[in-house]
């Protein structure tokens, strides 16, 4: 059977050790882009490329600390991370990893605080030029592709 390896809570060294010593699909269930917000939990561009090379997913985490260095993040910050990954490796490697159950109230976004607010993200993706099939991939189809292989 195939396995999926989640590297979200791994150090960068552990990430690269995992790449070197395994062949399974890599996912970051709830991580963002280090080049936009240099939090140690976020992924470098090289890590994002390695995940894509293994046909994995980066699940965008909706925690202000991982989206924006200072202040409270909002949907615009999510879009910045999605655009960065899209430009770097393509739309097929982006999903959501909201971590709504793990984010303290003080680190929640100003406009998306729970699942009921997801239409805000969908509308912002449309305004940002994403097509419906691309939005569907981000909102769940990419995860279904990865999960169907185990």
Language model: regions and residue ranges:
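Conserved, mostly hydrophobic/aromatic
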Residues: 5, 30, 58, 99, ...
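Alpha-helix N-cap and loop-to-helix initiation/capping positions
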Residues: 39-43, 73-77, 109-116
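Mid-to-C-terminal alpha-helical segments outside catalytic/metal-binding sites
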Residues: 113-150
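Histidine/acidic residue-rich metal-binding segments in metalloenzymes
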Residues: 1-27, 40-55, 76-92
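Short acidic/histidine-rich active-site segments
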Residues: 62, 89-112
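A conserved active-site cap/scaffold subdomain adjacent to cofactor or substrate pockets
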Residues: 52-67
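Acidic, His- and aromatic-enriched active-site or binding-groove loops in soluble protein domains
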Residues: 26-34
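Active-site environment of divalent metal-dependent phosphoester hydrolases
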Residues: 10-16, 33-36, 65-67, 102-104
